[in-house]
Amino acid sequence: MGRFRGSITKLSRREGINLAETEKVQKYLDRRPYAPGQHGQRRGRGRPSDYSVRLREKQKLARLYGVNEKQFRNLFEEAANVPGVTGTVFLQLLERRLDNVVFRMGFASTRRQARQFVGHGHILVNGKRVDIPSYRVRIGDEISVAEGSRSMGFIQENMEAQKRRRVSPWIELNPDTFTGTFVRLPAREDLALPINENFIIEYYSR
């Protein structure tokens, strides 16, 4: 499964969840709560197999974070080999990706936009430019927008919007200085994800 580059709204309709985690996409899903295409409203009448349910759950989570199959499986295998609850550890590893942290801090409006900002060199980690979206953020790391990028229209708009939203509890954010700190790992109850990670564990354990 490669990284999806088409319409995030259309893919969200197909998966049945708001993959962009934006109000705009959610409003669209509320109006059209069925898969795209001429047969979208008639889908889902047959009972899916256990395999297809688990495959779909894996695809939903991978697409939510914008991770390709190789990266996704590598992270899962890492999570399965460290102490702790595998599903929670797996989600924490996904949350620690730099592109995701940039999104959580509100510097970008979507994870896709966050990947672009990181790749184009607009993001600093502890004062140093990092252009790798999969870079793993550590507890205590300070993430900021490069000074020369703070005047960009998109980033200005994103930070104004973030001031009206609740900041994730594992993050400290100073919108006025375009700076945030990753203060702790998120607990499972912190993550309001419409995902059953146990299905993903079962998928890879088959």
Curated annotation (Swiss-Prot):
NCBIfam families: PRK05327.1, rpsD_bact. GO terms for biological process: ribosomal small subunit biogenesis; translation. Residues 28-52 are annotated as: Disordered. SUPFAM superfamilies: Alpha-L RNA-binding motif. The keyword rRNA-binding applies. Keywords: Ribonucleoprotein, Ribosomal protein, RNA-binding, rRNA-binding. The gene is rpsD. The keyword Protease does not apply. Belongs to the universal ribosomal protein uS4 family. Residues 96-171 form the S4 RNA-binding domain. GO terms for molecular function: rRNA binding; structural constituent of ribosome. It comes from Deinococcus geothermalis (strain DSM 11300 / CIP 105573 / AG-3a). Pfam families: Ribosomal_S4, S4. Part of the 30S ribosomal subunit. Contacts protein S5. The interaction surface between S4 and S5 is involved in control of translational fidelity. SMART domains: Ribosomal_S4 (SM01390), S4 (SM00363). One of the primary rRNA binding proteins, it binds directly to 16S rRNA where it nucleates assembly of the body of the 30S subunit. InterPro entries: Ribosomal_uS4, Ribosomal_uS4_bac-type, Ribosomal_uS4_CS, Ribosomal_uS4_N, S4_RNA-bd, S4_RNA-bd_sf. Gene3D superfamilies: Ribosomal Protein S4 Delta 41, Chain A, domain 1 (1.10.1050.10), RNA-binding S4 domain (3.10.290.10). This is Small ribosomal subunit protein uS4. One of its GO terms (cellular component) is small ribosomal subunit.
